[in-house]
């Protein structure tokens, strides 16, 4: 009876890494579930199956699906976990139904075990910590309640003959909420309605997720339009601003002029938050101010939250709700939520799912707005509705074959502080590159035309924007090679985005690519670049220091009247740019750290981002 086979199927397992030196790999195995054990075999064609491992069902402590937003590194994308003894087995099923069958069957057979855990970890153990709760011990107590009876003894109903769509979502499935509307006529995609809930079916692609609506319709949608439904996820609330500097927060609140206008924003310490509120009560009616309150956490498990010690709450939304109705120790009641950037949907990685080659007939050219290394830039529209920037590539200006090989990869680089490449037109000469349109043009021109109007805090915010984009490229192992204010663009609300990353690889003009060429940007180049053409993320850091200098000098040319050869000689003898008038001592110190002689002595962009955020939060 104990050998009766309940389920059998080919699945993929991740190594359990029972020893510290064990490799982390994935193996295809033939799994067999009986009343006594869960066994897995190596299944080689034409040969007898070889038993590779077996777990007694009586030793199982937990069986549950794994909810995660990471890209699954094997071709089966539906993970579940089997916790037994002191080990953790991750198994990957080919589809949702297969995973459901295995989890239900295993739960049914183990729900009366004596060793079941009260709590489990719903996300992966990766890189030395739990992704769900950031605990650093692999055997740490879980962070979510485990219910061994949930869905056990319950089989999903088959679809009715006239309706083959999926049934409504199972409780274990990840539910996401749309932050924005999304309209589409593409049969592969699904339209989104703001604040509606959807079931996440597949998140293996970073920028486009497959979801299901409440009517059972499925399709791909931009992942940046969605947020996971969770009591502690703040992104669905109109008062939350994820990435905004203290200076920008103060400007927005002052612009409202309303007593009690407020927002919740990320603090400089990851995972902590600040409430910023406008008031006229502290100083005078004619001299209002912004008060900042750090949201503090108790040492309880689970944590609780407070601003004033007398009023402690189980979640941040509950805390905000209370203070919207009661002052409770704050200078004023939280009356008017202020949100930055939520009115406009974020750009997507590609104009449509899987679409990176654009038909020229879909583009309308409106007017020429500039020229660059590759050719002319036009304002235009895609399908007469989406405003875009169209770069027409001059014949002989770039290595087109090399670029086309890289274009699809470059399109997948997507971040709020990068100018998005939407696609390319290849069907006619010259080829065109279609980019996100940025309202106010390049940063260097913007700084010069507005010179004398900038506060130092605003300039620091510009540097922070660029640093955010560069930290993303650094993590993605992408080298810009030509970072400068001329290659950053200014959008609405003075948001700065990095443009033309990696494009110099495709330039054919030797005067631009050779360090001896008259067009080579020596004034932004590190010593190892102009001496040996050695590009790296650390050579980008040097260029970022020069860009900071450009920003705080409001668009001046670095080294001003010096020739390229004189600049090379100056830098080689230890000369560095002077401190701009608007740069504080702390800001200038960061510039000098970027200009260290040896690349390894320069900070990473991730570190620069933390340092600049600290200065922005504490004041220049």
Swiss-Prot record:
- What tissues has this protein been observed in? T-cell lines and natural killer cell lines.
> GO terms for CC?
cell-cell junction; cytosol; nucleus; plasma membrane
**Gene name?**
ITK
Cofactor(s) it depends on: Zn(2+)
Matching entries from Pfam families are given as: BTK, PH, PK_Tyr_Ser-Thr, SH2, SH3_1
Q: How is the cofactor bound?
A: Binds 1 zinc ion per subunit.
Name under which the protein is recorded: Tyrosine-protein kinase ITK/TSK
> Source organism lineage?
Eukaryota, Metazoa, Chordata, Craniata, Vertebrata
What residues bear Phosphotyrosine in this entry? 180, 512
Q: Name one GO biological process term.
A: adaptive immune response
Q: Which organism is it from?
A: Homo sapiens
